[in-house]
Amino acid sequence: MKKVLVFVLLFSLVSFSPLHAESQNDDAPVKMGEIVVTATRDIQEIRKAPSNVTVITAEEINDTGATTVVEVLDKLESLQFRTYSGNSSQSQLDMRGFGGDNPFGKTLILLDGRRLNRTDMASINWLQTPVNTIERIEIVRGSGSVLYGDAAIGGVINIITRKGTDKPKFNASVLAGSYGLNDERVGVTGATGHWTYAVTGENNFNSGYRDRSKYSAQGGGFDVGYAANDLLNVSLGVSFNKTDYQMPGALTKEQMEQDRRQYQPALPAYFMNAHPDDDGSDKYTNVNLGFKSFWGAWGQMEINFLYGKKDLQMNMPSWSSYNYSDTNADTYGITPKYILAKEIFGFHNKVIVGVDFYNEPYKKDIFSDRERTKQLSAAEFTRESMGCYLRDEFNLLKNLIFSAGYRFERASIKGSNLDFLTPSNNFTDQKNTYNAEAYEAGLTWLVDKQSKVFAKYSTVYRIPFIDEVASFSGFGGNFLTGLEKEKGISVEAGAEFYPLENLKLGLTLFRVDMEDEIEYVYNPVTFTGKNQNTGKTRHDGAEVSLSYLWPKYLKVFGNYTYHTATFEDGANNKKEMPLVPKHMANAGMEVYLPFNLTLRPEIHYVSDSFLSGDNDNSTEKLESHTLLNIYLNYKPTFGNLNLTAFLGVDNIADVKYSSFGIDYAQYGMPNFYYPMPGITYKAGLSFTF
């Protein structure tokens, strides 16, 4: 840690020293197309990135009537969400077929560049970032291990919050809908002199489609920026959120036929309890202090000091008396980087070099009662990592870009467990260290003014979660010193073409081969199990997208995704991985009607997939489903007042479906499913001035 602080201090002194600085204004402004930050960790035109990239703006989010980030992302190619409760509070993301039984560490989620992924084996809470705080969301499909390291396998999603610009703007909205949905938002952004500011707040509540599936989320944030001069910018962003949620449990098919909206009843024949009291409460705080120093022809330096805090309370008496837990997880990060764009022999070249340091203390206490009067165990761990990366882009020709990069990362997990009931589960000061490398090389051919063709080869890796390495949650205690990281190779190629000015066609093909994937292996003889590096898997896929704009009349859009994910060795060789649908498709149109009205019908299709745990593909599948949605927007303008009125109906046909199911047939029990909401109505009103 001391070495890191010394490095950062020296880096900062050099970064913000004016001795070699030249005014940023010395460079003539360059006109760019649609830009993205996540693909290269710097401002970059989307079409120059060797990746399939999507950017969603705040205006697009507002037009959809979405109340959560999950609702925004779920209609994009290669993205699918599953949930245990029918709402967004416990959603799990499948990106590029990396769903399976452990999707948590296969897609990297960022908030303004800071990692949101948890260090334990659990999904992030997607409600921790209110949609009112979001300026844009950038989705970069495919490997990002060189630039971001651990977990950037299926892709990287960066949620970028609002920043102040220009004159002050005030916005507010209210939305209500079925199952007790109500959502209220307010915000103000602006700039004055050298200062910029943005303040937002949101309240989101839903009683839930099922009994015991209620959630409420309150959050907000602010961002303050100061441009000291042409050489230095300073920014401070802070966000917070509190989410309370219930967990209704799963149902058998017979129970769903009786009442698909009930919480899970008891099944004494299978020693399964009812779920009338399962719930949780999460609190999140995120802080990002950033400095940018512009050196003109000598490039620019950036450094961010990051802090995140998670206080998570979980109550699951339906499982056992061991399932009252408090988890406290902090994140301390320092991420300096240097960027230099310079011509070499008349050809454009840009190099980025940086360091990502994270220190993440983790503490979990388990109790025997909701009041936390009797503690059963206490576990404390620290995950620390430092990754150094280098990436370069060089124009071989004016319209042909070669990119290459390398990353080395060292991560350690160390900690102790104290079990007050079973001392044999105790361990002290155990430690694992992981060394990881990633490489990438890509080519991007710029065709005409808008189109591109690209190809990319890269390696990927994932460091084990704390609770994959250590067992400390009331089911034994051990520390697996031999558990290795997951690693793999990713290859992709694609194109985006504009055969007409307003017609965009996209196609991306990819393959990811993984090895040493971590799986819990159960021994039926000893009735025990542990996590092991079990073998190889393959993920093949294709992503197709289309959009066409007929100005003043309509916009047509659609996408299709093909996935196949298979085990490539062992007893289940060539069997399909669970919870990966082969086909997903979305289509819709915006019809621009008179009187500032816009009608948007949509269709959403997901094919069947094998149930969780069905590695040998021996039981029934999770059924396919097709959903129809329709929305109507009214957007008049009264001087400086911009108004949007919104009406929407999701799942018009009231389709009965589930997004998640578990194979219990292998244990002689019925399979279990998590029902999703039926037909849902919602309406809202927003204004900006």
Provide a role label for each language-model segment.
Residues A176-F205, R210-G249, D278-G296, L340, ...:
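Transmembrane beta-barrel wall of Gram-negative outer-membrane proteins
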Residues D230-N241, G280-T422, T428-D429, L446, ...:
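Face-selective signature of the C-terminal outer-membrane beta-barrel domain
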Residues F345, L397, F402, R410, ...:
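Gram-negative outer-membrane beta-barrel transporters
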Residues V69-V72, Q92-R96, T107-L110, N125-P130, ...:
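N-terminal periplasmic accessory domains that precede
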Residues H194-W195, Q300-M316, I366, T444-P464, ...:
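Membrane-embedded beta-barrel scaffold of Gram-negative outer-membrane proteins
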Residues R114-R141, G482:
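Short acidic/polar hinge/loop motifs at secondary-structure boundaries
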Residues A250, Q255, N359-S368, R410-P423, ...:
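Surface-exposed extracellular loop regions of Gram-negative outer-membrane beta-barrel proteins
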Residues F7, Y226-A228, S239, L390-D392, ...:
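Conserved C-terminal beta-signal and adjacent last beta-strands/turns
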